[in-house]
Amino acid sequence: AYSWDNRVKYIVRYMYDIDNDGFLDKNDFECLAVRVTLIEGRGEFSPEGYAKNKEIMANLWNEIAELADFNKDGEVTVDEFKQAVQKNCKGKAFANFPNAFKVFIGNQFKTIDVDGDGMVGVDEYRLDCITRSAFADVKEIDDAYDKLCTEEDKKAGGINLARYQELYAQFISNEDEKNNACYLFGPLKEVQ
């Protein structure tokens, strides 16, 4: 479940493919704008926030389509996305990622940092994990969080934005299945 191939499939399936149709398209990013707006407002919908997020997500879709929609059909398949990650991200640090990936990673952090304190603690990590997978025991999630965090992370009270960016970059750019970044999104399942 922690192979590079499965991790990239996981990103497509659980982070971008909001409408669950098996590929990425403009609709996914329109849905992401609504999701991010509601999360940022903790359930309240701000028309101004939505307008901003809709523009950000439209730009993000355009950049991702430019990087990954190789056959220009308005859809990015899992294979196209993997090729784009391989070409643009694999073996690179966050600072060297295309802007589209950087923006998405920053937005992802904001949606996980529910209390807005600039840190993702174990409680927020748990909430993030249960939005994508089913767990019979919270210990499974807590064990993944312990594997993810370094002693410095634990002393700081969690993962800050810079650390999250570094971990996300390792998640999609590093093939090492033992890398602690493999646990960024919780215990992973094999993606079909």
Swiss-Prot record:
Superkingdom of source: Eukaryota
Modified-residue entries (N-acetylalanine), positions: 1
Keyword annotations from UniProtKB, A to Z: Acetylation, Calcium, Metal-binding, Muscle protein, Repeat
PROSITE patterns the UniProt entry points to: EF_HAND_1, EF_HAND_2
List of residues binding Ca(2+) 1: 17, 19, 21, 28
UniProt keyword annotation of Metal-binding present: yes
UniProt domain EF-hand: residue ranges: 4-39, 56-91, 100-135, 136-171
List of residues binding Ca(2+) 3: 113, 115, 117, 119, 124
GO MF terms held by the record: calcium ion binding
Subunit text: SCPs from crayfish, lobster, and shrimp are polymorphic dimers; three isotypes (alpha-alpha, alpha-beta, and beta-beta) have been identified.
Role played: Like parvalbumins, SCPs seem to be more abundant in fast contracting muscles, but no functional relationship can be established from this distribution.
Note: The sarcoplasmic calcium-binding proteins are abundant in the muscle of arthropods, mollusks, annelids, and protochordates.
Name used for this protein in its record: Sarcoplasmic calcium-binding protein, beta chain
Taxonomic classification: Eukaryota, Metazoa, Ecdysozoa, Arthropoda, Crustacea
